[in-house]
Amino acid sequence: MANLVNIKEHKEQARKAPIEVFPDPKIAVVLTYQHVGAANSPLVSVGDSVTIGQKIADSKERVSAPVHSPISGKVTKIGDIYNSCFAECSEAIWIEGDGKKTKDKSLTPISESDLQKTANDVLIKRIREAGIIGLGGAGFPTSVKLSVPQDKPIRTLIVNAAEGEPYDTADERLMIEKTENLLRGVKVIRKLLGNPKVIVATKVSKVEAVPKLQEVFGKEPETEVIAKHFTYQQGDASVLQKAILGYEVPPDKRSYEMGTIVQNVATINAIANAVFEGEPLISRVTTLNGDVAQPKNLLVKIGTPISNILVQNNIDTNDLRQVVVGGMMMGDSIRTIEAPVTKRTSSILVFSKSKYKPGQKETACIHCSNCISSCPVRLHPVLIYQALVKGDFDKAEKLWVKDCIACGTCSYVCPSKLPLAGTICAARH
C-alpha cells in the first residue's frame, strides 16, 4: 500500500471567491484538437462568418469531440499556436468577434420531464455533438466513456468531487453554486448507465460545498455523499475508486469492466447544460491563483488568450516566472501567455519572479525510496527514470511506465529534486 501524500492545498482564498463571468475575447483562438483521440479538421475557412456555439472543427472518428465557436464573428486565420493540452503547437482557428452575440441553435434543449423517454442514443449523440470531454484533466470524450457495452453492467457511479489539485477550486465553486445542475447531470448519466448507485465523493475541507451536496443529493434514491480526508492522489479516478470501493482496476482492465464509472464534477455540469439548455461546451470555470492579489474563479470562454485574463486582472506580465495551466501537479508550464484557454484549463496559476525563492538544486539519487513508497499505483519511479535517462525504453516498459497516472508525487517527495515525473510523462507521450 502506498503512503499517500498530503500536499498543502493553497485554496483558502480561492474557495471563497464566487464564480465571475469573464468578458468575451475580442479575438478567440480555438484549438481544433483538445481531447484524447483522433484530431479534428476545420469545418470553416478564413472569411467565413460564425455564430456562438457553431461547430467549427470535427472528426469522423469515434474517439473524438468537436469544438465550437465561443463568439460570433468572422474567421480571420487558421494556423498553429501553443496547445497546453499536449505541451506543443497545434492547429487553431482565429475568430474576430462582431459584438452581435448571434447564437447557433443546432442543439435543441430537452426538457427534464422528457428525459426518461428520450432514447439513450439520442443523449449520447447530444453529449458528443456538444463536444464534452473529461474536464478533470483527462480529456477523454465523454460520449465514448458513457457508451458502455450492454454486457458490462455498471453498479456504481462515483461523482469525483475531490478536486485534489493544489490551488484549484473551480469544481468546488460548481458544487456550491451549481448543485442543482449537477444533480440534473447525474440524472442523465444514471439513465445512460442503467440507474446505478451514486456515490458523491468529496473532501471534508470543502466546508461550504459538503452541506450543499448533502442537501441536494441526500434526497435522491440510491445516492450517498461521502466526505473524507482524501489526499491529493485520491483525486485521481482509479485511486479514488479504491478509496471508496476498496478495490482497484487491474492494469489490463478499464473501470467500466469492474462495474464502475467515475465522472468529474465539471463534466457533469457540462452534460446538464448540453442536454437541458442546448449549450455546447464553449466555456468553463477556471481558477486564477498563485502569486495574485485576489484569487478568482472565472467563467471563461474557451479560446480566450491567457494574456487577456492576466492583463485584465492587473497581473504584471513582466514579472512572470511561470504560468501553469491545468493544475500545479499535473498541469503544463506554458511557453507563451498567448496560448488560449482550452476545455482542460481547470486553473491558471501565476508565479512571479519577485516572489521566487530558489530551492535546492538537483543532486544524485540518495536511494531513500520516497518515490517508491509514495507512488499511488506502486511503480518504481526512480528505476523507470534511470532506464529512460539511459535510453532503455524496453526496461522502462517492463517497469510498467505506461501505468503511471502522471500525478507528480514522485518529484514532489524527492529530496534530490530529480525530474522524475517530467521525464516519465515525456516518455509516455
Listing of model-derived features with the role each one plays in the protein:
Residues 99-119, 123, 131, 136, ...:
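Flanking helices and flexible, charged tails adjoining ferredoxin-like Fe-S electron-transfer domains
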Residues 1-43, 94:
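N-terminal, Lys/Arg-enriched amphipathic/low-complexity engagement segments
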Residues 346-362, 372, 376-429:
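Ferredoxin-type iron-sulfur electron-transfer modules in oxidoreductases and energy-metabolism complexes
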Residues 73-75:
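Conserved hydrophobic positions within beta-strands
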Residues 82-140, 149-151, 207, 224:
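Acidic low-complexity segments
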Residues 50-64, 79, 90-97:
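Short hydrophobic beta/alpha edge segments that flank linear recognition/processing sites
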Residues 40-49, 53:
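Short histidine-centered loop motifs in beta-beta connectors
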Residues 195-306, 312-319, 327:
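Hydrophobic alpha-helical positions that pack around
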